């Protein structure tokens, strides 16, 4: 799982070194990670790609961070404001 924007080089490095069946990422440039995965599958490698979206992939971590941070900042209210999915699907 590589949430947010790790970049194509990190995605591909993880795919090569870890050899996952499924690489779950936050976002990708269409000319990097998706092309690598397509080429890998054409070469017979057993790997798939799931792109969650940048903000959606980071949302759980941001909610956790607000809970973790609150006790560290006594006297200051810490609030996580959910960004939700920025896209509407028809």
Per-range role (PLM):
Residues 1-90:
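Active-site catalytic microenvironments in core metabolic enzymes, especially phosphate/sugar-handling
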């Amino acid at each position: 799982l590589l949430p947010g924007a790790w970049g194509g080089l990190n995605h591909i490095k993880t795919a090569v070194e870890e050899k996952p069946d499924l690489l779950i990422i936050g976002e990708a440039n269409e000319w990097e990670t998706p092309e690598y995965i397509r080429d890998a599958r054409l070469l017979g490698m057993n790997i798939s790609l799931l792109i969650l979206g940048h903000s959606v992939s980071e949302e759980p971590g941001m909610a956790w961070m607000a809970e973790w941070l609150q006790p560290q900042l006594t006297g200051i209210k810490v609030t996580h404001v959910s960004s939700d999915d920025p896209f509407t699907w028809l």
